[in-house]
Amino acid sequence: MGGGWWWARAARLARLRFRGALLPPPRPRSGGARGSFAPGHGPRAGASPPPVSELDRADAWLLRKAHETAFLSWFRNGLLASGIGVISFMQSDMGREAAYGFFLLGGLCVVWGGASYVVGLAALRGPMQLSVGGAAAGVGAVLAAGLLWACAVGLYMGQLELDVELVPEDDGTTAAEGPDEAGRPPPE
């Protein structure tokens, strides 16, 4: 049960999609088209792209789902490592030192999964048949998930928590002996 089959499929789709851009332009066979860069000249003038078949749509959908599954796997592993960090954080002082390692491991998993998702999304947007808006929504969702994870871990470790301590000011002078605002005498 290998997991690398979809990389081969993604590479094939990318090769088919970018083959025209990577190959050198064909040389003209007749001298009539030489030197003309105006649109409307040449053998492919007015040729529309081939229609997208159901098989192409299914391939794009499968590639998107495999790509999202890879990110979710990394994110799940990051959450699992962070959960182990929370458990060890509560154990003892030695557990707190181990917890920082688990939080770091969880962060590496979340960051690596998010970065590989964003890079893969940028590289395979064409074969996935994603619009720019769809790709931007995917990137936004990944960034939001990573930010929520970072905020949760930061709040748990107390890094973002503000400790406000109310300390009465004592400048060395005592209040005048006399009744307070309610008219009661001072305590003895």
UniProtKB/Swiss-Prot annotation:
Compositionally skewed regions (Low complexity) per UniProt: 29-38
Where is it located?
Mitochondrion inner membrane
Q: Which UniProt keywords apply?
A: Membrane, Mitochondrion, Mitochondrion inner membrane, Phosphoprotein, Transit peptide, Transmembrane, Transmembrane helix
Query: What cellular-component terms does GO give this entry?
Result: mitochondrial inner membrane
Q: Which InterPro entries match?
A: TMEM160
Q: Which domain of life is it from?
A: Eukaryota
The residue ranges crossing the membrane are 102-122, 135-155
Q: Cite the PANTHER family for this sequence.
A: TRANSMEMBRANE PROTEIN 160
Q: What is this protein called?
A: Transmembrane protein 160
Taxon lineage: Eukaryota, Metazoa, Chordata, Craniata, Vertebrata
Q: Which gene encodes it?
A: TMEM160
